[in-house]
Regions:
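An N-terminal, well-structured beta->alpha segment
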Residues: 1-64
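Glycine-rich phosphate/pyrophosphate-binding beta-alpha loops
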Residues: 142, 249-282, 361-365
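Carboxylate- and glycine-rich phosphate/diphosphate-binding segment that chelates Mg2+/Mn2+
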Residues: 150-258, 374
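N-terminal small/polar loop signature for handling phosphorylated ligands or for N-terminal nucleophile
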Residues: 42-115, 230-241
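Gly/Pro-rich interdomain helix-loop hinge
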Residues: 273-350
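Short, amphipathic C-terminal "tail helix"
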Residues: 347-384
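Glycine/threonine-rich beta-strand-loop-alpha-helix active-site module
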Residues: 74-176
Length: 384
């Protein structure tokens, strides 16, 4: 079997790595940026840390900040207009998955205008040309959008999240600078960190996993287990922030190339229909879906238990699986993640609708254990 592994052309890591930006702009022969970010990152001065680097280097730019927490088709169309008017020749994405995913859609459609309706990008679109060059600087340690070939856009008209998979969308350059994450609020640090853990665990047990992807996912789980609580409780701790920044990227390197599973399949409609933050949805659902999947992946669950420091000598595979699930659940509780859908304003009568959407989601077929719409409904009920 032939396997494919796609990564960025160049990536930089470490506090202050944003200072590498001008050199990469020059190396790529680029001239002007459209900065894609959100209003909060501008308000709290995070985006300014990157804009200062551009200013010092004399690199011109314009700013597009009309990006929602769960970016929509409308956001993308506004971004396309902004890019066309700006005269920019590259996209500079500053933010979490929302900013980077929006940049991917803008970049792909600009060079593949036949997809200008945006909705036709859903699934594996047959694009012919690479995106406009994207340089991505994540400000959260969670989505790993800077290294993946996936992006998610909400089709607000049909209340669904479109998962788009396209090797042509991957950012040319990723700059993972933990200093951009120091002011991330506790709740967002927790949610994005558990999003990264979900990527690592689902990427480890998905049907498409293999030895190379496993290697990255196991390391990501170990690093998240070691650093997440400290990053939540000590936001300016450089070791914890940098550890999480690298861990989420490592998780993304692998899952982007092998797929995910039912946790993401179930999280997507929560975001599309009810605007629940993606990391919160994943974090709440992860231990519940892990329990369901355990019989299909017991050996991998032993590995997860070891990576989470929950394995004890002499445990059976079933005991180790239980320990792995409990370790994930307890971590989620300790960092303050809601444990019930009712806490998020979801009503019990909404669950069948969610189950139908989750069963049809592009991530669900990668689940290691075969799953039906009825199974998904029962899992939502457990989460309720």
């Amino acid at each position: 079997m032939t396997r494919r592994f796609i990564l960025n052309e160049v990536s930089y890591f470490g506090p202050g790595a944003r200072k590498e930006l001008p050199g990469e702009v020059r190396r790529l022969g680029l001239h002007k940026a459209l900065v894609c970010t959100d209003k909060d990152l501008i308000k709290f001065g995070v985006a300014q840390k990157v804009l200062d680097v551009l200013d010092e280097a004399g690199i011109p730019y314009e700013v597009f900040s009309e990006i929602k927490q769960n970016p929509t088709v409308k956001n993308v169309k506004l971004g396309l207009e902004a890019f066309a008017k700006s005269g920019a020749d590259f996209l500079l994405a500053i933010g979490g998955g929302s900013s980077i995913d929006t940049s991917k859609a803008i970049g792909i459609i600009t060079n593949n205008p036949e997809f200008a309706d945006v909705v036709s990008l859903e699934g594996v679109a047959d694009t012919k040309h690479k995106s406009v060059p994207i340089i991505a600087l994540p400000t959260t340690a969670g989505t790993a959008a800077e290294v993946t070939i996936n992006y998610v856009i909400t089709d607000e008209e049909n209340e669904k999240k479109m998962v788009c998979v396209d090797p042509n969308d991957i950012p040319a350059i990723a700059i993972v600078d933990a200093e951009l994450m120091y002011t991330l609020p506790r709740s967002l640090t927790a949610a994005t960190g558990l999003d990264a853990l979900t990527h690592a665990i689902e990427g480890l047990i998905t049907k498409g996993a293999w030895e190379m992807s496993d290697m990255f996912e196991i390391k990501a789980i170990e690093m998240i287990a070691r650093h997440l609580e400290t990053a939540v409780n000590e936001p300016s701790n450089p070791e914890a922030r940098d550890g999480m920044a690298v861990a989420q990227y490592v998780a993304g390197m692998a899952f982007s190339n092998v797929g995910l599973g039912a946790v993401h399949g179930m999280a997507h409609p929560l975001g599309a229909i009810f605007d629940i933050p993606h990391g919160v949805a994943n974090a709440l659902l992860l231990p519940i879906v892990m329990e369901f999947n355990a019989p299909a992946a017991l050996d991998k669950y032993v590995t997860i238990a070891k990576a989470m420091n929950a394995y004890r000598e002499g445990m059976t595979r079933e005991e180790a699986a239980t320990a792995a699930v409990d370790a994930v659940r307890q971590l989620s509780i300790r960092v303050g993640i809601p444990q019930h859908l009712a806490e998020l304003g979801i009503k019990e009568e909404d669950l069948p609708r969610l189950a139908k959407a989750a069963f049809a989601d592009v991530c669900t077929p990668g689940n290691p254990r075969d799953i039906t719409e009825e199974d998904i409904l029962e899992l939502y009920k457990k989460a309720y």
